[in-house]
């Protein structure tokens, strides 16, 4: 990492199912010399997982308040935490890893802007009807809305960088999540819903219609568009690499394996403590199973739900 002063706190969160993801995320930072302070929101973690993540240093573990909403809906609550004393805050989803030293991408060029990726072209659910709902809800709960949307596409929020001067905006985002999303919402809603991507959609609505929202930065470099040796790798779709490998996630094996090896070499975890999907000897099996993984995963989840009943 460069010699400059650390000016960003990285924030992430996960329930029990994402604890290994959070460990991989923070480990990827430390492996690449990114010694930024990290806040991890958690719920349902074992003491062993808490110890493993804390052992990486500079990590504050915070038990999330009780909520029936998915963990991702607590993004703004964690990002505006009073314990953050850096100029910038970066949200990073816990199903991800940093490749290379990404220090440069953890700060914005302009404190008046939010760094977040925009979809281009707009997704199918970015309709006039959904925009009308966004505008209506901003008018209803926020005291007024822009006549027209600032943007013609919505945002993608696994990686966000914002200056701490926007704490009030984060508070508005948090309130609006409670205002417009169901109290028991999961990570996504019915396809076509104005708030299909839950907290991400709420954030998009504010950036489009809230008069005093930050502008979206034109430059988004965390996806490797500027430097392919330094980027934020987001493991989209289920199952996740620590659970089961699928055809999509196979491309991330070269990102995940070095982080797991680093954890082993530095005594942060033992081989027999790793999930089977992260054990080197099991890789041929998971690679062969990958095409069927989504169906196996759905069947496993269905079985768990049935037995809960």
Predicted stretch roles:
Residues 2-6, 146-153, 164-309:
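A glycosyltransferase accessory/donor-loop signature
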Residues 53-64, 76-78, 112-114, 230-233:
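Active-site regions of enzymes building and remodeling cell-envelope glycoconjugates
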Residues 43-48, 100-102, 219-222:
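Short, polar loop motifs at secondary-structure junctions
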Residues 72, 76, 157, 196-201:
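Conserved glycosyltransferase catalytic-site signature
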Residues 136-150:
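Short, flexible, basic/aromatic active-site loop/helix in glycosyltransferases
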Residues 98-137:
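Conserved donor-nucleotide/metal-binding helix-loop-beta segment in metal-dependent transferases, i.e.
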Residues 1-70, 84-85, 273-276, 280-309:
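N-terminal anchoring/stem segment of glycosyltransferases
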Residues 24, 64-104, 116, 260:
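A conserved donor-nucleotide-binding helix/loop in the catalytic core
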């Amino acid at each position: 990492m460069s010699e400059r002063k650390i000016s960003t706190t990285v924030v992430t969160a996960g329930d029990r199912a994402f604890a290994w993801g959070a460990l991989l995320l923070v480990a990827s930072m430390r492996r690449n010399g990114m010694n930024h302070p990290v806040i991890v929101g958690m719920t349902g973690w074992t003491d062993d997982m808490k110890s493993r993540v804390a052992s990486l240093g500079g990590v504050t573990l915070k038990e999330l308040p009780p909520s029936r909403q998915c963990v991702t809906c607590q993004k703004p609550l964690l990002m505006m935490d009073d314990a953050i004393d850096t100029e910038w805050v970066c949200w990073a989803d816990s199903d991800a890893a940093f490749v290379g030293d990404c220090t440069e991408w953890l700060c914005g060029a302009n404190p008046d802007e939010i760094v977040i990726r925009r979809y281009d072209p707009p997704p199918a659910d970015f309709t006039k009807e959904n925009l009308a709902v966004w505008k209506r809800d901003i008018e209803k709960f926020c005291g007024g809305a822009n006549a027209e949307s600032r943007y013609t596409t919505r945002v993608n929020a696994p990686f966000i960088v914002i200056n701490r001067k926007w704490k009030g905006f984060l508070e508005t985002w948090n309130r609006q999540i409670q205002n417009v999303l169901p109290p028991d919402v999961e990570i996504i809603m019915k396809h076509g819903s104005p708030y299909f991507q839950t907290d991400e959609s709420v954030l998009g609505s504010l950036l489009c219609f809230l008069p005093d929202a930050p502008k979206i930065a034109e430059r988004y470099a965390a996806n490797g568009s500027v430097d392919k040796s330094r980027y934020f790798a987001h493991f989209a779709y289920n199952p996740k690499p620590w659970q089961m490998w699928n055809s999509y996630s196979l491309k991330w094996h070269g990102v995940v394996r070095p982080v797991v090896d680093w954890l082993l070499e530095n005594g942060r975890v033992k081989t027999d403590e790793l999930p089977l999907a992260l054990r080197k000897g099991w890789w041929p099996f998971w690679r062969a199973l990958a095409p069927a993984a989504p169906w196996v995963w759905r069947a496993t989840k269905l079985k768990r739900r049935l037995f809960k009943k």
